[in-house]
């Protein structure tokens, strides 16, 4: 292999080309590659953060859903207790009203019974006086009659 001036000229030209590329071409290419690498790393970090945020949001949503279900169950339980309480109160009021109506009816019955007894006593007294008049054949004095009726009514 012959080393001649052409080979030396080509080597010098190649060396100048390499130096030119290292000085003017290579730094922008390296900078562009570093920027691209940084953008890719930032994108991956953002994707990881988004995945973590999504997972946290899903956990939070699940927790809120469980809390809402628990609150709903508690509200339903309170409603059932309140309904049972209202039913018990209504039953108690109905029982009190029934007792009042029963007492009033018993009082009316007692009053009517007493009225019937008084009327019956008066009729029995009149019948007794009438029967006595017929037996004796004479009328009895009015004062004596009233006294006998009262005595008879008291005995009855």
Curated annotation (Swiss-Prot):
Database matches in SUPFAM superfamilies: F1F0 ATP synthase subunit B, membrane domain
One MF term in the entry's GO annotations: proton-transporting ATP synthase activity, rotational mechanism
The entry's keywords: ATP synthesis, Cell inner membrane, Cell membrane, CF(0), Hydrogen ion transport, Ion transport, Membrane, Transmembrane, Transmembrane helix, Transport
Transmembrane segments: 12-32
Membrane topology (UniProt): Single-pass membrane protein
Entry function: F(1)F(0) ATP synthase produces ATP from ADP in the presence of a proton or sodium gradient. F-type ATPases consist of two structural domains, F(1) containing the extramembraneous catalytic core and F(0) containing the membrane proton channel, linked together by a central stalk and a peripheral stalk. During catalysis, ATP synthesis in the catalytic domain of F(1) is coupled via a rotary mechanism of the central stalk subunits to proton translocation. Component of the F(0) channel, it forms part of the peripheral stalk, linking F(1) to F(0).
The protein's name: ATP synthase subunit b
Organism: Pseudomonas putida (strain ATCC 47054 / DSM 6125 / CFBP 8728 / NCIMB 11950 / KT2440)
């Amino acid at each position: 292999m012959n080393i001649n001036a052409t080979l030396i000229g080509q080597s010098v030209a190649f060396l100048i080309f390499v130096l030119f590329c290292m000085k003017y071409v290579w730094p922008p290419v390296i900078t562009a590659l570093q920027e691209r690498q940084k953008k890719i790393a930032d994108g991956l970090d953002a994707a990881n953060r988004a995945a973590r945020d999504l997972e946290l949001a899903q956990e939070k949503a699940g927790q809120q859903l469980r809390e809402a279900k628990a609150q709903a169950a508690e509200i339903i339980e309170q409603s059932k207790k309140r309904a049972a309480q209202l039913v018990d109160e209504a039953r108690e009021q109905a029982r009190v009203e029934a007792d009042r109506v029963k007492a009033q009816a018993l009082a009316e019955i007692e009053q009517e019974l007493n009225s019937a007894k008084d009327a019956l006593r008066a009729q029995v007294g009149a019948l007794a006086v009438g029967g006595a008049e017929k037996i004796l054949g004479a009328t009895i004095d009015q004062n004596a009659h009233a006294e006998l009726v009262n005595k008879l009514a008291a005995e009855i």
